[in-house]
Amino acid sequence: MIKDEAYLDLLSENFVDFDFERCSSSNVFAYAYNEKTNVLIVAFKGGKIYQYLRVKPSIYHGLQKAESKGKFINSQVIQKGFKYRKYEVQEPENK
């Protein structure tokens, strides 16, 4: 399992136009939104990262206010069928 700070650094380095917000969710590690491109990025614990396309600002603002980030993402993003790109982070091998 990748360490939290290393995961956050990786996100910031690879998605430079996004400011990630950490959250205290059992499934969601962090999320970020770019209002210029309407892209929402959700980084899940365990290393899966989803980049959701054409997400309205109102969805992002709802996510910010949601008590359960995971439930909100499931009902308002995943179940709504937003197109996405999926990435997966793997722990580097020790040599």
Locations of regions flagged by a protein language model:
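Acidic/histidine-enriched, beta-strand-rich ligand/metal-binding domains
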Residues: 2-95
